[in-house]
Amino acid sequence: MEIRLPDLALKRIFSFLDLFGLLQVSQVNKHWNRIADSDYLWRSLSLQRWDCSNFTNQHLGTHTWKQFFLHQRRKELRLALAQPHNFIYKVTKNIAFETELAYLSGNRLTVDEQEKSIICSVSPKQELCAWDVQEGTMIWSSPVQEFHFSNLVTLPQMHLAITMDRKKTIKVWNCQDRDALAVLPMPQPCYCMEAYLTKDGPFLMVGDAAGDIYTFTLPGLRDVSKVTAFQYGIVLLHCSPDKKWVFACGTYSRTLPQVFLTESLLRPSEGSVPLSTFLPHKLCASACWTPKVKNRITLMSQSSTGKKTEFITFDLTTKKTGGQTVIQAYEIASFQVAAHLKCPIWMGASDGYMIVFTSGPYLLLFSITGFLLQRFEDHQAAINNFWVDPCYVLTTSENSVHVYMWEEGGRHPYLRSCCHLENTWHDHTTDSCISSVMCDNASIVLRVRKVSDSSILVMYSLNT
């Protein structure tokens, strides 16, 4: 006699499965297929993999969450499986300036097959520019600015770009209208900005040279809160993937970094101090949140001589004590990088149990406890640029780019070597190097700095 579990119990069991598990159980019988195809399970899978908490049924249209998930995965795999001949590339003239690049398009989270990749850059004339990556054309530019841009971030979900200039002025642009949507002068230079979207709306967080963290609404730049975090400037400011936590680190290396509860910054109470805790490790050089374990953060700590590097991983929780909420940070793992390895500059994380970083020409993947999982030798010379997100890892060396992809569900091989793009665009008559690299599901963008101090953009897109 066949035992039929209630729908709720079966849905609970299926919630522990990954993509491949759900697809397998859906083939057992009609009952299991109906449960395995439910929007609840596929939305849960989507939330685990992407920042789509604000993606609604209205965005889906007539599509289901299963169709949405499989569509996104196909796009990810399409880039990962591409070979050099599958790309076309466009090269700009000497019109790029050495400041940040940022995607304005939300290419990753759509069900539109005709989506475009749009990148923001700054020109030598101090214009903010938006580029159609597939066409290689500039589609918008701001008026020439009086002062140089010092910082650029975007909020793709809102199609907004936010700039800071050397006059300490923040401006918000929609990259369609001529003028900025909002302008706000700041009392101090700002070293870092973070734009993010929550269930309460879009916000901008800014860390300044005085050690203060400001929170503003977007696009209007209305003041929400100001918190003094350090007595020195803030150089690192990172929101956790679920936007629940904010990591902040000051310029003074012996100051302990802090983690704030985002809600206490967005809803400040008069006379009360925002909830925060110190992470008990000094000399923090970099930090990254884990996309899959959203309350987990890994710090990279380096000695002043640069000869000793340590990775420390913490889990953050809140706890009620005596009627008050407190933040607790638990160190769950740490390890020191072997002395014979070149001191890493960049780092990234994926599933909560692995750390990826560069060392000379090598890309290394370690467990958070210090066990070497993979070593990649896809470059002959030292890696001079590195970029990581929940799907891809990019490395550059001299004038080539290598693409890696994280395996689904932390399966072996944990990080897959995919595609190597050589310098087909390179002008061999001049010296140059790649100074920035990033990608979305349909494109790879490089900024290449020439010896003359001018820069160009090289925009790869998949040939459809």
From Swiss-Prot:
<feature type="repeat" description="WD 7">
    <location>
        <begin position="370"/>
        <end position="407"/>
    </location>
</feature>
<keyword id="KW-0853">WD repeat</keyword>
<comment type="function">
    <text>Substrate-recognition component of the SCF (SKP1-CUL1-F-box protein)-type E3 ubiquitin ligase complex. Promotes degradation of interleukin-22 receptor subunit IL22RA1 in resting and IL22-stimulated conditions by facilitating its ubiquitination. Functions as a cell growth suppressor.</text>
</comment>
<feature type="repeat" description="WD 4">
    <location>
        <begin position="222"/>
        <end position="263"/>
    </location>
</feature>
<feature type="repeat" description="WD 1">
    <location>
        <begin position="89"/>
        <end position="132"/>
    </location>
</feature>
<dbReference type="GO" id="GO:0005829">
    <property type="term" value="C:cytosol"/>
</dbReference>
<protein>
    <recommendedName>
        <fullName>F-box/WD repeat-containing protein 12</fullName>
    </recommendedName>
</protein>
<dbReference type="InterPro" id="IPR015943">
    <property type="entry name" value="WD40/YVTN_repeat-like_dom_sf"/>
</dbReference>
<keyword id="KW-0833">Ubl conjugation pathway</keyword>
<dbReference type="Pfam" id="PF12937">
    <property type="entry name" value="F-box-like"/>
</dbReference>
<feature type="repeat" description="WD 8">
    <location>
        <begin position="416"/>
        <end position="461"/>
    </location>
</feature>
<keyword id="KW-0677">Repeat</keyword>
<feature type="repeat" description="WD 3">
    <location>
        <begin position="178"/>
        <end position="217"/>
    </location>
</feature>
<comment type="subunit">
    <text>Interacts with SKP1. Interacts with CUL1. Interacts with IL22RA1.</text>
</comment>
<dbReference type="InterPro" id="IPR052121">
    <property type="entry name" value="F-box_SCF_Substrate_Recog"/>
</dbReference>
<feature type="repeat" description="WD 2">
    <location>
        <begin position="136"/>
        <end position="174"/>
    </location>
</feature>
<feature type="repeat" description="WD 6">
    <location>
        <begin position="320"/>
        <end position="367"/>
    </location>
</feature>
<comment type="pathway">
    <text>Protein modification; protein ubiquitination.</text>
</comment>
<feature type="domain" description="F-box">
    <location>
        <begin position="1"/>
        <end position="45"/>
    </location>
</feature>
<dbReference type="InterPro" id="IPR011044">
    <property type="entry name" value="Quino_amine_DH_bsu"/>
</dbReference>
<dbReference type="InterPro" id="IPR036047">
    <property type="entry name" value="F-box-like_dom_sf"/>
</dbReference>
<dbReference type="GO" id="GO:0016567">
    <property type="term" value="P:protein ubiquitination"/>
</dbReference>
<feature type="repeat" description="WD 5">
    <location>
        <begin position="270"/>
        <end position="315"/>
    </location>
</feature>
<dbReference type="InterPro" id="IPR001810">
    <property type="entry name" value="F-box_dom"/>
</dbReference>
